[in-house]
Amino acid sequence: MLTADDKKILAQLWEKVAGHQDEFGNEALERMFVTYPQTKTYFPHFDLHPGSEQVRSHGKKVAAALSNAVKSIDNLSQALSELSNLHAYNLRVDPANFKLLSQCFQVVLAVHLGKDYTPEMHAAFDKFLSAVAAVLAEKYR
């Protein structure tokens, strides 16, 4: 459960991410494909090479969804409902993969933000990503 402090910290973090979110989304996906190659199976029609336009485009979508989730933090289920339906019913993505992408996004933020990515931000963002993953997995039940 995200506290009021967590939400405040997330807003501060997302201000730092603004302007870089597309780049960070792309890098998180590229990192996931290298670190967890089994995730590539969900993208058989993509060129998965680093710098691929398809990966960049999907990274942009991931970042936009996270940005929307940050803005709609008090109503994640409604904000992510369409995305949850898409991943559960159409794409049939194993929900365990949401955690893998979350880990990769955490690494990207740590690399790019350095000391500005405080332990408090890391903890709040981890809780947030867990909440997002839980909402995305709701339709699987």
UniProtKB/Swiss-Prot annotation:
Gene name tied to this protein: HBAD
GO CC annotation terms, alphabetical: blood microparticle; haptoglobin-hemoglobin complex; hemoglobin complex
Pfam families with a match to the protein in the record: Globin
Domain Globin: 1-141
Keyword annotations: Heme, Iron, Metal-binding, Oxygen transport, Transport
Gene3D superfamilies cross-referenced by the UniProt entry: Globins
Cross-referenced PANTHER family: HEMOGLOBIN FAMILY MEMBER, HEMOGLOBIN SUBUNIT ZETA
Function of the molecule: Involved in oxygen transport from the lung to the various peripheral tissues.
Domain of life: Eukaryota
Subunit annotation: Heterotetramer of two alpha-D chains and two beta chains.
Keyword Transport attributed: yes
Biological processes annotated in GO: hydrogen peroxide catabolic process
Molecular function terms from GO: haptoglobin binding; heme binding; iron ion binding; organic acid binding; oxygen binding; oxygen carrier activity; peroxidase activity
Listed name of the protein: Hemoglobin subunit alpha-D
Positions annotated to bind heme b: H58, H87
Entries under CDD domains matching the protein: Hb-alpha-like
Tissue: Red blood cells.
Family that this chain belongs to: Belongs to the globin family.
Keyword Heme tagged: yes
